[in-house]
Regions:
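Active-site rim helix/loop that mediates acceptor-substrate recognition in acyltransferases
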Residues: 28-81, 224-273
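Conserved acetyl-CoA-binding loop-helix of GNAT-fold acetyltransferases
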Residues: 92-118, 122-127, 138-140, 304-324
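Active-site/acyl-donor-binding loops of N-acyltransferases
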Residues: 137-152, 161, 165-197, 286-288, ...
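Conserved GNAT-family N-acetyltransferase fold
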Residues: 60, 71-73, 88, 93, ...
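Conserved acetyl-CoA binding element of GNAT-fold acetyltransferases
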Residues: 85-97, 286-307
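Amide-forming acyltransferase catalytic core, primarily the GNAT-like/NAT-type
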Residues: 174-295
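Eukaryotic N-terminal targeting leaders
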Residues: 1-51, 123-151, 190-192, 398-402
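Contiguous mid-protein beta-loop-alpha structural module that forms a pocket-lining wall or clamp
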Residues: 104-227
Length: 402
């Protein structure tokens, strides 16, 4: 049997027929990605994302001779966290259950990466370009999202979240094996939260640059250049805001969410020494029943003081999660035990406390449990495998994935 490669991108493939085909693709992959949503609701939300011209996305998919869609991958470009860098997120990886164990998605991923990096269309075995494949539009789209100066600099990285362990290592992706997800289920929430205005502050999207730059609070920076997408964090502000807004649009979160979703973090100062500060950022995860704390900064030296800070952060995070989840359609089908707050020790930034000490403090705070690598493994691949040693993610990679 032979298989044909197709592509659709939301910059040039916007005809009525293109949109109709895109809906079929979303319906096909919905069994793996819709969660509690009805297929039609999943289609509607994803089509909003596809039809949002301010964002960029491209799908490649294989069809069998009988017209079945058998494998799918989506490539989403994101501004890198270093200036002048780009992150290509490999997502929506899907194989039709009737066509599994044939290596089809592996062939598709290899072809897509090679096509992006070299422009060639070499094929593996029984795969060919579909007769309707619009190569000129496809190349024009890639040129649009990959400016020539970035391509020449090779400051491009592929990233993904794997739910199949290190499977993607065969494509050159390096796992962030030191990621340990520490989780708190909603049935263990303490939502008795009231802001202590003398020592605490809710952080908002409007002034996130002020909080994120460490100079104001003398908080540490990560400066190891090998840790891609980690240093020079002040470069993340436009990308963070863009990704956050994308999440709101994707999930149809309107007025009710904005009241609570305007907050992006929590600042707490020492009660006796105001110079001792901890900042925790918070954001919805791409699984709608999960909330992630994607970065924690502290200059606190004493573990007991930090434990107090974390207890307050936990109460804030539980309050935030409850408010946000109450506004998301279809979450009523989830039990509290399936609603989760997440943080990783690799997202902890401190010059005085170790990541192990951070993990120990968290897991000694009511209800938090270390789940190890958990449900997702962040992975990264250098453009053309050009770096020696290869880049690695110094944190959970979440900033790259939203």
């Amino acid at each position: 049997m032979s298989y044909s490669i197709h592509q659709l991108n939301n910059k040039f493939n916007r005809s009525d027929n293109d949109l109709k085909t895109m809906k079929v693709v979303y319906a096909t992959i919905s069994s793996s990605f819709k969660g509690p949503l009805e297929t039609s609701d999943f289609q509607h939300l994803e089509m909003q994302h596809y039809e949002d011209y301010t964002a960029s996305t491209q799908f490649f998919y294989l069809t069998a001779e009988n017209g079945d869609i058998v494998s799918v991958v989506e490539i989403v470009p994101r501004q890198g966290l270093h200036q002048g860098t780009l992150n290509l997120l490999l997502t929506m990886v899907f194989t039709n259950p009737d066509y599994r164990k044939r290596g089809l998605v592996a062939k598709l991923i290899n072809w897509v990466i090679n096509f992006y990096e070299t422009g060639t269309t070499d094929f593996d075995g029984a795969i060919k370009l579909a007769d309707c494949f619009e190569m000129d539009q496809c190349r024009e789209y890639i040129s649009l999202i990959l400016p020539e100066e970035i391509v020449k600099s090779e400051k491009i990285h592929w990233t993904l979240y794997s739910i199949v362990g290190e499977y993607y290592a065969r494509f050159g992706f390096n796992p962030c094996n030191d990621t340990e997800w520490i989780e708190l289920c909603a049935d263990n929430f303490d939502v008795d939260f009231e802001l202590k205005e003398d020592t605490e502050k809710l952080l908002t999207m409007d002034n996130i640059p002020t909080y994120f730059t460490a100079q104001k609070y003398n908080l540490p920076h990560i400066e190891d250049e090998r840790f891609n997408n980690c240093a020079l964090e002040e470069a993340t502000f436009p990308g963070f805001v863009q990704r956050y807004q994308s999440y709101l649009n994707l999930n149809g979160l309107k007025e009710e969410f904005s009241e609570h979703g305007k907050y992006c973090g929590f600042l707490i100062s020492g009660e006796l020494d105001a110079s001792q500060k901890t900042i925790a950022f918070i954001c919805p995860f791409f699984f709608m029943n999960r909330i992630v704390i994607p970065r924690v900064y502290t200059n606190v030296r004493d573990k007991n003081i930090f434990k107090h800070h974390w207890e307050r952060i936990s109460k804030f995070a539980a309050w935030y999660a409850k408010q946000v989840w109450a506004t998301i359609p279809n979450l009523s089908d989830y039990e509290d035990a399936d609603k989760v707050l997440m943080v990783t020790s690799s997202d902890f930034v401190s010059e005085t406390l170790t990541r192990q000490e951070f993990a120990d403090v968290i897991t000694s705070t009511g209800g938090w449990e270390n789940r190890g690598q958990g449900i997702v493994l962040p992975m990264i691949r250098d453009w053309k495998l050009s770096r020696k040693p290869p880049s690695r993610l110094a944190h959970s990679g979440y900033w790259s994935f939203m």
